[in-house]
Amino acid sequence: VMTKRNLQLWLSYIVILLPMSYGVVNYAALPAKMAIHFNLDNQPNGMAAKLLVVVGFPIMMMAFQLICVGVTRLNANHKAPAPRFEQMIIWIVPVLSSVIYATTISYNLDHQLDIWRIAVSLIAFIFMAIGNYLPTISANQYAQMHRGGHTIRPMIWRRVRYWLGYTLVGGGILLLLSIVTTAWVSVSLMGIIVAALVIMSLYGTLARN
């Protein structure tokens, strides 16, 4: 009998591969060299062969999904299981892959797109997904997920996990709001969020010793 997790896993692979039909249908209309990377002014600064993008990218993301899910499952088997984390991992890669693939194909078909706004929205999505998950991790699960299994005082971790969670969710919301401004506002905001996360993580690490 297929478990709910296995069903979600198979669906995630379908979600990764399904957008490839968009690229295959429009293959003849796509340029031989496709733009795959862009600067803050929405100008392409990285190119790749058409076949590599249309067919290679989904296959690469499938392999990446297999690695992410495999490592997560291995970690759960040998350390502490984290069902919500596994579920989040299962769907982050397919969502990112689908949006990135569709955006890349659309841009190379000369559709007008704001690449940086799409990129910032994806980052905001990741921040909020992780931030929503973090407060569910117990101190023991956190310790087991790190090499050596060092203990962390429950009170310290309870405080830190909410700080991290609120920062990620709040930061994600602010990033979404920043797309109505300029690219540099979004970049600056990301820098502040990352710096805050590093400081909080250091506090949690030092406070446990």
Where are these regions (language model features)?
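Small-residue-rich transmembrane alpha-helices that serve as helix-helix interface/gating elements
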Residues: 122, 186-200
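Ordered, amphipathic secondary-structure segments that act as subunit-interaction surfaces
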Residues: 69-117
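Membrane-water interface of transmembrane alpha-helices
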Residues: 25-30, 62-74, 128-146, 207-208
